[in-house]
Amino acid sequence: MLFSRNKIQIDVYINYGNDNVRHKKLVAEPGINALDALEEAADIEYTPDESATNHHGAMVTAIDGFKVGINHFWIYYIFEKNQAGWRLPMCTPDSLKIVEDTRVAWRYHTSTNGKDMQQYGPLSTSTCISKIKRCNRQF
């Protein structure tokens, strides 16, 4: 008899803006990437390789019909087990391997100046503000 690997739980949150946040629980094999987890949770569009814009990997261009544009864009965040808060991964979603129970959130940002994106986290609504974890070190 073959033994199967343990499954992991992934909570996928999608914040469309205007207080519209959706949550989907997934059970998956360890090693699934963040893009595949999103694809299981929503109807998505993405470009498989954005190396022309110096993003070496896939970029999400639409989730459930909410498309990127000049002032609209999707950013994803991760909240790993035993971590203090949400963080911005420094890689494209197809490169981020999820190996343990994790929360992944996608937020549809509408901004002309970027300040909102830098200050508020993935689940911010008019009634609840979530902040993102920051690193103050200079690189």
Language-model features and meaning:
Residues 1-139:
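Ubiquitin-like/PB1-type beta-grasp interaction modules and other compact soluble beta-rich domains
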